[in-house]
């Protein structure tokens, strides 16, 4: 099989692979919710992809016959992309950053198996190298499905 220009473009757009993400975030199956990162500027912003598949365990019960991605998992996927913004900042202490709060999160439409979430996060603030806030948006086919601000803190 030969590479086509389209496959070359798709490969060159991957900034972080799933293996590289696993080296930066502590999450593992079934809670690793970022498949790849297509844009990443440490300390500024990140854009990640979550491919939603019917094989994910949450769809067994949410909801039988009409699978919908739980909103809490959409928010968690946004938080994981947000976490990638700070993981490679050299002046931050190493450790586990966890949720400290969420503000203004809104869900605009359902996310279903077959959808591809494109999640973009921007760092809004970072205080004392321990507390931060990101603005997050998740879109499917260019349509906003979820947005809000997520806070995190470093756990000792």
Swiss-Prot record:
Keyword Lyase: yes
Highest rank taxon of the organism: Bacteria
EC number: 4.2.1.59
Single biological process term from Gene Ontology: fatty acid biosynthetic process
Assigned GO CC terms: cytoplasm; membrane
Pfam families attached to this UniProt entry: FabA (PF07977)
Top EC group: lyase
Function according to Swiss-Prot or TrEMBL: Involved in unsaturated fatty acids biosynthesis. Catalyzes the dehydration of short chain beta-hydroxyacyl-ACPs and long chain saturated and unsaturated beta-hydroxyacyl-ACPs.
Gene3D superfamilies: Hotdog Thioesterase
Localisation per UniProt entry: Cytoplasm
An example molecular function term from Gene Ontology annotations: (3R)-hydroxyacyl-[acyl-carrier-protein] dehydratase activity
Signal peptide (UniProt feature, chain positions): none
CDD domains registered for this protein in UniProt: FabZ
Protein name: 3-hydroxyacyl-[acyl-carrier-protein] dehydratase FabZ
Family statement: Belongs to the thioester dehydratase family. FabZ subfamily.
Stored InterPro entries: FabA_FabZ, FabZ, HotDog_dom_sf
Reaction(s) catalysed (UniProt annotation): a (3R)-hydroxyacyl-[ACP] = a (2E)-enoyl-[ACP] + H2O
Keywords of this entry: Cytoplasm, Lipid A biosynthesis, Lipid biosynthesis, Lipid metabolism, Lyase
Taxonomic lineage: Bacteria, Bacillati, Cyanobacteriota, Cyanophyceae, Synechococcales
Residues at the active site: 62
